[in-house]
Amino acid sequence: MKGFSVKPLIWITMLFLGLLPYQAFGLGLTPGNFDTILDTHVETLTVWQLAENNKIYVFDFHGLVTQGKTFNRITHLTEQIQANAGYPRVLTTDEFIKYMDSLRRTQADFAFGHDLLVSELVLFYNLADRDKIDLLPEEIVLRTFLLDQGLIKVWRNFYQSVQSDVVILSIPQEQPHTEGTPPVSKLARQAIFLHELSHGEYYTNPHFAAYCRLFWNQSLNDAQRRAFVNLFKKYNYNTASGELMVNEMQAYLMFTPDPQSFSASKLGVTEGELASMRDMFRRGRPPTRLPLR
């Protein structure tokens, strides 16, 4: 019928059948500074726009599983090595589940936080379309948000970045341990948020990014760089990406205040050497307002 759109009917049907998270409707932006975001308890998915840097959006999830279903497969594409793949591609749902099983991981603990440029999200959705990969409902909700906020658009059946320099971060709320889901303590939430926020700073502050590259290449010695690369191999990062190594180095070294996530023993150095690296980073006066450890 003229003037009638089936799209709302499809969404309502999917919601009724449990195929879409209830957060799919009315997902907008809430302004908030670092402390407000960190200290606010939310029962449903909330998307914050960071007051200190309006190019950073923070997806604040009530549960790790929903966060994982939204971002894990995208992070696998952008940050991890794709074995036996001649070209970048999005894994099917079954392939990704098998991949997580091989790592003894689940949607809940594959990653505890995420950081993505809008341009990387465009890559994910275009590759998924190219290979006719079925998206999870949570991934569809994310795509709809990006379209509704004018961050991406569709042109000739391809997704394009409209604001390619906007950064999407993801963090979980505090939660107790449940069967199949690890706990997230207050300290862990703070560490995850600060860690991911440092990635946002790296992406949106070119002076800070340049400082970090200089620190990696000129301040750290070969053994220290190898220590970070070896650690990141254990975390399944794509260590062939030099830019990723620099970005992760600064985030773990200076902005991960949780010994369960990062410590001298995990890096394979002494406490004194770790303290020395942090001191070198601070003494160089990095151009950032983030709190340095």
Question: Model segments located where?
Answer:
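Classical Sec-dependent N-terminal signal peptides that target proteins to the secretory pathway
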Residues: K7-G26
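Short, flexible loop/turn elements at secondary-structure junctions
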Residues: I171-Q175, S198, P206, D258
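N-terminal secretory signal peptides that target proteins for export/translocation
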Residues: M1-V6
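Metalloprotease/metallohydrolase-associated module, dominated by Zn2+-dependent proteases
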Residues: S164, Q218-R293
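A metal-dependent hydrolase signature that marks the N-terminal structural subdomain at the beginning
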Residues: A24-S170, P286-R293
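Active-site recognition of the HExxH zinc-binding catalytic motif
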Residues: A191-T204
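Post-HEXXH active-site segment of zinc metalloproteases
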Residues: L187, T204-L231
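Short pre-active-site segment immediately N-terminal to the catalytic Zn-binding motif
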Residues: I171-F193
